[in-house]
A protein has these predicted regions:
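A short SAM/SAH-binding and catalytic strip from SAM-dependent methyltransferases
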Residues: 109-123
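Conserved class I S-adenosyl-L-methionine
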Residues: 43-52, 142-152
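A short glycine-rich, Lys/Arg-flanked "PGG" loop and its adjoining helix->strand segment in the class I
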Residues: 125-140
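Class I SAM-dependent methyltransferase SAM/SAH-binding core
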Residues: 52-99
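Conserved alpha-helix/loop element of class I SAM-dependent methyltransferases that forms part
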Residues: 24-42
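A short acidic, Gly/Pro-enriched loop at the edge of an enzyme's catalytic core
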Residues: 98-110
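Class I SAM-dependent methyltransferase Rossmann-like catalytic core
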Residues: 9-28
């Protein structure tokens, strides 16, 4: 979450520093719809890619789950969320969405919001492949992303 050097800081962190709290397409309404559509239950093992400030993680953890893992590449975020959202079934891991180091076929539901949009096409493919790898057979991968359409 380093925003000291504006030339090197990620745009979403600069906006957050300026007070912008909802940095997702469709706002909180679409986030809630995504979470509702996942229909969490007490046996679910869930992974969130790039939980950021933890809004969606807090909605997810309001459900009874078997386990929740948030994977974020920012050490400050992992530390902050580990303190802010303490739960027996939750953990926040420092890592990369394209290489989580989680066991194959071990998760029921994986989701991420507005994070694929920020990556190059080859990285998007790697992240989607990783979601597929860690999902159990019949598991769900839910995303909330920008869609761009050429009007020409």
């Amino acid at each position: 979450m380093d925003t000291k050097d504006i030339q090197k800081a990620h745009g979403h962190w600069i906006l957050a520093k300026m007070g912008k709290r909802v940095l997702r397409p469709g706002g909180k309404e679409l986030t809630k719809k995504l979470i509702d559509s996942l229909a969490f239950n007490a046996s679910d093992d869930v992974v969130e890619f790039a939980p950021g400030m933890g809004f969606t993680a807090s909605l997810t953890l309001a459900h009874k789950l078997h386990s929740y893992v948030g994977i974020d590449a920012d050490e400050d975020i992992v530390r902050m969320l580990s303190k802010k959202l303490q739960s027996a079934q939750a953990s926040f891991n420092l890592g990369n969405a394209s290489q989580t180091n989680l066991k194959s076929a071990s998760k029921d539901k994986v989701y991420g919001e507005a994070m694929l949009t920020m990556h190059a096409d080859h990285r998007k493919s790697e992240i989607i492949r990783e979601a597929h790898r860690i999902l159990k057979k019949g598991g769900w991968y839910a995303i909330h992303e920008l869609g761009l359409t050429n009007v020409d």
